[in-house]
């Protein structure tokens, strides 16, 4: 039996998980997802880890492996570090065993990964554009529109005449949105337009790694945005790809899960 922790330090949040692994049967003990905001991500990771230990009734000495991913390589108490594409692929297959591709949609970039049935990476590609296709950009727009982040997806699905944001540059795209607001364009139509722009680029990213059929699991901070997921599948159909994108309630934890599993089987 192995007890292993996975810590994914991202740009916007720290995701921490704790597993007990016996054979090939993992038991999820505890999890936390903490927004970084203005805090030190490494101190936050340590607080989260200690909180999970307390929740699970464990001591630090009970944990066999502390695996990090994302920006966690400099975390003082980690045992080993794993690259994000490998952890997201492994975590995705745990969450959905049929997943043969992953879309990691994070605060600063998007990443498409093609993987096998074990969660081993076959190829991957990241967005090269600046942040108009990122979670941070969408968060900034939501703040400007005066809406909560968790309202973005549902508002997007209410659009009746979306206004597409064409600019790749985040600064220019934000200027486009300001102009839309001054023209009286509704929040649902603005958000749907942003989703259309993001989804088009993400679908092309999937195609570029050869993900042309099967299940795609969305991971990362934007994975639970149902408006983006709906628009992504619309874009996939338009590009005549035989894949379907899904999410999972625990999609944001995929990187931390994968790190924990790679640590357990070292």
List PLM regions with ranges.
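Adenine-nucleotide phosphate-binding core of ATP-dependent small-molecule kinases
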Residues: 173-207, 252
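Short glycine-rich, Thr/Ser-proximal phosphate-binding strand/loop in the N-terminal lobe
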Residues: 4-43, 121-124, 128-129
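Glycine-rich phosphate-binding loops at beta-strand->alpha-helix junctions
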Residues: 210-235, 248-252
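Short glycine-aspartate micro-motif
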Residues: 2-8, 63-67, 100-104
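Short beta-strand-loop/turn "lid" adjacent to the catalytic site in phosphate-handling enzymes
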Residues: 32-38, 55-87, 113, 122
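Phosphate/pyrophosphate-binding loops at sites that engage ATP/ADP/AMP, CoA/4′-phosphopantetheine
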Residues: 49-64, 202-214
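Glycine-rich phosphate-binding/hydrolytic loop that grips phosphoryl groups
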Residues: 138-139, 246-266
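Glycine-rich phosphate-binding loop plus the immediately following alpha-helix
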Residues: 37, 120-161, 261
